[in-house]
Amino acid sequence: MFLLDTNVLSLLMTAQPPPEVGGWVSAQPPDLLFTAAICQAEILAGLAILPEGRRRFELETAARAVFLEDFEGRVLAFDSAAAENYAAIFAASRRAGRPVATIDLMIAAIARSHGASVITRNVSDFEGCDVAIVNPWTR
């Protein structure tokens, strides 16, 4: 099971995703590809601050289609199990003197509660979070 991080999803939504990412994602069985509602929120928030107009409307429409259609049933929520994992990861990173951004902690906690690998270019954001990390750019 793979949880696609926001940076991977953003690139997949472009007209021409980098071949490393597009190729890696295409090589995976679609039913193993998931994302998190946290990633959905990050993408929609980024689009919401764009100037109003046709471009923003088209991008928001395309992004919503990705989450509602392409990832239908495969957008993972931050639930009670994720909350428990969040607390454990937070405490471990704090003890190690290595703070992790809240959003990245939430994504890691969701992945950990589902036994998923995080697919990201931002490997350092998830190091020490006790989740498997895959960087499609280095595969």
Located regions from the model:
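Active-site neighborhoods of divalent-metal-dependent phosphate/nucleic-acid chemistry enzymes
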Residues: A45-P51, E69-V118
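Short secondary-structure boundary/capping segments
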Residues: G23-A27, V66-F67, V75, A92, ...
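A generic structural signal for short hydrophobic patches within well-formed alpha-helices
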Residues: L9, Q40-I43, A83, F126
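Short, well-structured N-terminal submotif of metal-dependent ribonuclease cores
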Residues: M1-C39, A48-A65, R139
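Residues that scaffold the ATP/ADP-binding catalytic core of kinase and kinase-like folds
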Residues: L11-L12, W24, G46, Y86-I89, ...
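Histidine- and aromatic-rich ligand-binding microenvironments
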Residues: L4-D5, A36, V100-A101, N122-V123
